[in-house]
Amino acid sequence: MCRHKNLGNSTMISNDFECEDQLNMHRATPCHRYLLALPLKPSHRGLLLVVGCNPSTADANADDPTLVKLRTWATFNGYSHLAVVNMFSYRETSPRKMKAAGTMTFLEGGGEVDVWIERAASIASDIVLAMGDIAFKSWGNFRNPFHSTTESGKNRRIRARSRLVEIVDLIRREKQKESKIFAFCLTKAAFPGHILYLPNSLKSRDNWLDVTEHNFDTG
């Protein structure tokens, strides 16, 4: 079980309130990552929280393509810090190994995952949902390793959307009143799009979709 500092009263990150102090930087175990928090440049806009699907091997010292793009877009829009949490904490980049772990492992959330989502949402200036079509045949150009598991596609879609709704409800309860919830875009299946496959024309915050009040129950 990860240990963390007590945040006390919810306080938005600002120039003089370091993200490291509030979130105690990244939290990882060999198989799970619950939160990755990175300082960017001093700015008035504060912390951008991004909710992905599941964590890669990236950490505070090593980027991956998704983290590089998130960092670039967050800096472009004037955020002072970037924090990344995920719907699921299972940490793996190999489709073969992810498939071996099983759909149940992948689609299980809650617990420690939700604790870190709550903590980050309570101090974020803005939140972006960016998990992609997690229950469908592919993620962008990559085959979804869970598409051919024994669980039916319909059942996976129901559970995946249920987890999305669960997280959105959690964020709405915990976020600052003035904070907005965005998606870079919505896919055809009405899931928030994954940043890795999106054009730079969506880089500006002005082009993000405000989904603060969006109903994800029905897609």
Specify the residue positions occupied by each region the protein language model found.
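Feature marks short, surface-exposed loop/turn motifs that line or immediately flank catalytic pockets
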Residues: T57, R91, A135
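Active-site and ligand/interface coordination hotspots across diverse enzymes
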Residues: M1-D64, F76
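Glycine/proline-rich loop-helix segments at beta-alpha junctions forming the active-site rim
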Residues: M98-G219
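Short connector loops at secondary-structure junctions
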Residues: S80-M98
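Short amphipathic alpha-helices and their capping/turn segments at secondary-structure boundaries
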Residues: L35-P42, A62-L82, V115-I123
